[in-house]
Design a protein with these regions (language model features):
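N-terminal "first-domain core" detector
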Residues: 1-11
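N-terminal amphipathic/basic helix or basic patch
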Residues: 12-17, 105
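Ser/Thr-rich, low-complexity intrinsically disordered terminal regions
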Residues: 15-65, 79-84
Length: 121
């Protein structure tokens, strides 16, 4: 499921500042990066299953490995984890309404924090 129009996809920011803010909102980058791309995930464990709110991005300057990069974020996605196959983000997936609302709230809070660092740039 895509969360279109959140404004997150318009954010471009320094990787280190981005890592700090994403972590403060419960997103983990861990080893999910290469030299040009990053992926931040927030895990939701519920009775209905395990879900991930994912925000990906790509380097417009520098490289992620050196921790000196400027990242352009992409449209947030919500996916359901299926063991052992992985996470499905397809439009055919069904998500609990409470999860969708929680994800929207998280994205709104995140957007607010991201605006503070993009205003500095």
């Amino acid at each position: 499921m895509k969360f279109e129009g959140t404004g997150i996809e318009e954010v471009s920011a320094d990787l280190n500042k981005l890592d700090f803010i994403m972590e403060s909102e419960g997103f983990v980058r861990a080893d999910q990066w290469d030299y040009e791309r990053v992926t931040y995930d927030r895990k939701y464990s519920m009775v209905e299953g395990t879900f991930y709110l994912r925000i990906s991005g790509y380097a417009t300057e520098g490289d992620v490995g050196s921790k000196k990069a400027h990242i352009q974020l992409l449209t947030p996605l919500l996916g359901k984890h299926y063991y052992p196959h992985g996470v499905e983000y397809g439009e055919g997936e069904e998500f609990p309404k409470s999860l969708i609302q929680s994800s929207k709230k998280t994205l709104a809070q995140l957007k607010e924090k991201l605006e503070s660092i993009t205003a500095e740039a």
